């Protein structure tokens, strides 16, 4: 099961033959120096992912060969972020449609999972996006769907995809600090599982595996369209 310790989701074993005792520095505050406590607080602010693993004790669960190895979790999406817009990936039966709010603070990319569900019609996506009043950068694979959402009053634009566009988006994301809101469970899961593909000999190649990536694809469309100017004319 998951329990929350100082805002960090920590896995606790529930196996009947296991007694899992999880302690942190909060259980020993009276014996810790002010210098140590300040170091821990600084880590919490400046490197929340390290704080989660090293201090609070969340299990390291980034997959081997992970594309994104350094990213953090924050409580809230910053209201002062710039270039705020949605990245939108479309799915239906088996794949979810993902609506990810994205924004920039200095060289940091902030991400907030607003919707992540299967079986959504264009009318459902419109209901999700309309209250925000933000620009949307979307997958260009289904022009009909983009037109329907546009007709619903949404400022939606199709991203320009082509040879090398996947890696271009990934490279730009890796050049930035990435922070994901703590409520964005599906997006966090994708970032942990998103790995480079392997060739027939088991060697990693410069191409990610194409699964568990719907939220990440939505973010990549935002990066391509809003930050790199790759919008279909």
Task: Tell me the role of every PLM-derived stretch.
Residues 29-88:
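ATPase catalytic-site recognition across NTP-hydrolyzing enzymes
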Residues 8-16, 58, 75-77, 169-173:
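Short, conserved catalytic or adaptor-binding loops enriched in Gly and charged residues
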Residues 18-22, 85, 156:
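Conserved beta-strand scaffold positions in the cores of enzyme catalytic domains, especially
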